[in-house]
Design a protein with these regions (language model features):
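Inter-helical turn/loop segments and adjacent helix faces that build the functional surface
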Residues: 114-122
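Long, charge-rich low-complexity segments
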Residues: 144-159
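Short, amphipathic alpha-helical segments
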Residues: 97-105, 121-125, 141, 145
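Secretory-pathway/luminal and periplasmic proteins that interact with or process carbohydrate-rich
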Residues: 39-47, 136-145
Length: 159
């Protein structure tokens, strides 16, 4: 498990700030921290048994590739920034296995595609619903109750 203050201060916040202030508001950082808390037990897993998802955000390869192919392809300035930040020419889903900041950025970009406004940073129930609707989806195994439980266990008090 990655200690929550360190995860936030050394990974999530600087990763999002490197994209620009419009990506790094407190609500976005809280949602990403909650996503990590639930999806990987705050960094305990980078790949779980029985599924394709990778990294501390447990993103499936098809989702990773879709962000690059159907979102970022229309945002060349952002693509250039990502290529400079991560010193990459071609995105590779395997980067989720070893690059914590890449995890934070990809998670933020996944949520950034959503038209619905982020819940307030202190609205954990709203964050749980947002995560379930836009990240885990109706077909996912996770529940809002589990999200809240994991948030309270791993993250609460650190942000």
């Amino acid at each position: 498990m990655i200690e929550a203050n360190q995860l936030h201060d050394l990974v999530v916040k600087p990763a999002l700030l490197s994209l620009g202030k419009q990506f790094s508001q407190r609500a976005a950082r809280t949602l990403i921290m909650g996503t990590i808390a639930h999806e990987s037990m705050s960094g305990r897993f980078i790949k779980q048994v029985g599924g394709p998802a990778l990294g501390i955000i447990q993103m499936e390869p098809v989702t990773h590739d879709d962000i690059w192919e159907n979102y970022l392809r229309y945002k060349p300035e952002l693509v250039n920034r990502l290529k400079l930040l991560f010193e990459i020419n071609d995105p590779n889903v395997d980067r989720l296995i070893y690059d914590l900041r890449y995890n934070a950025v990809m998670c933020r970009l996944h949520y950034r595609r959503v038209k619905e406004k982020l819940p307030a940073a202190d609205d954990i129930q709203g964050m749980a619903r947002y995560w379930k609707t836009h990240y885990n989806t109706a077909n996912g195994k996770g529940s809002t109750e589990q999200f809240i439980q994991h948030f309270n266990h791993y993250i609460a008090g650190a942000l």
